[in-house]
Amino acid sequence: TATVNSLWRDIKVYQNHAYIVSEAYEHGMQVFDLTRLRDVESMPVEFIADVNFKDFGRAHNIVINEESGYAYPVGNQDSGRNFVRCENEGGLFDGGPIFVNIQTPNVPFIEGGYEGSGYTHDAQVVTYNGPDNDYIGKEIFVGSNENSIDIVDITNKSKPQLISNIDYNNVSYTHQGWFTEDFKYFIVGDELDELSFGGNTRTLIFDLTDLDNPVFSFEYFGPTPAIDHNGYTVGNSYYLANYRAGMREIDISQIESKQINEVRFFDTYPENDNPNFT
């Protein structure tokens, strides 16, 4: 850690460099050159970061778009140090994404940010190549913002533009979401709905054929009442991590007809599948 211990830490990799954020106070972003691991001759070895980037404080997550060479720390809760244009009590850019240029991996610098939606818990950033021709080639941010989802064009780092906002029924904590590989659908997990409303693990699917006009498509309910956490798509599969029900693989090949089904799972907490944190 760059400062103190914390339960929350996130790491993403770009060009053989690990970018590390944490909710530890004043942590900023550590940059570590992973190629240093190739020359280890005797273990154990305690490494220090190559860069301790302190232009923002704590953050819950970090997102990287490898195509553009930008990192996006989200969930910042401390005021910034050097990039003060949007400082406020809620953190740099009010806890929204910070636009960090990492095209030279060990020389990060902030180019801007987006504060229009307040705190962002997690996000996906893509160079868009989907069905909406208005945004082909644009850099699109989709943020899970606790009680809604925001879609933002962040191509121009000094002038991000909100495209649309998504609300849905029985919202409790909009935690994380991910595009299908064709960018047509966005699959969302609400972390606390099982605790708040009961029922089995709920996954929400939105049709994003038109980014300006997202449409709720359908809900999928898993076989257990466990709390869901993060989910990612690979091809025709959606891999969903759950607190007490392990990793579930869901076949999404028939998502167009609103038919998705679990095909296998790996249980990491065999004691029970209750809607509790572990």
What are these regions (language model features)?
Residues 1-278:
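Feature marking well-ordered beta-strand scaffolds used for ligand recognition
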